[in-house]
From Swiss-Prot:
Pfam families: Ribosomal_60s. P1 and P2 exist as dimers at the large ribosomal subunit. Residues 85-110 are annotated as: Disordered. This is Large ribosomal subunit protein P1.
Length: 110
């Protein structure tokens, strides 16, 4: 990541943290105040357009919401909820057993 991208990213995060609208002018003002040398205005306008109308805090909170986040959330759940979260994993294991390739006499080298 280049210095321009980093500076624009950090400036956008600062604006989002303060609850301000992310615009190219505000990004450029923050970057200038930080005395980052020679950032082309294209970077600030790209970041402003990319983040226009989006809640940056919400984006950051949902970064890990892919497939791996559910088990981590299940560990923090209270008593009865933990048992409910573990049930689908057990069903999945049973399905895999049913779909196993038992020797049916159709071997390649029989």
């Amino acid at each position: 990541m280049s210095a321009a991208e980093l500076a624009s990213s950090y400036a956008a995060l600062i604006l989002a943290d303060e609850g301000l609208e992310i615009t190219a002018d505000k990004l450029q003002a923050l970057i200038s105040a930080a005395k980052v040398p020679e950032i082309e205005p294209i970077w600030t306008s790209l970041f402003a357009k990319a983040l226009e109308g989006k809640d940056v805090k919400d984006l950051l909170l949902n970064v890990g919401s892919g497939g791996g986040a559910a088990p981590a959330a299940g560990g923090a759940a209270a008593g009865g909820a933990a048992a409910v979260l573990d049930a689908p994993a057990e069903e999945k294991a049973e399905e895999e057993k049913e779909e196993s390739d038992d020797d049916m006499g159709f071997g390649l080298f029989d």
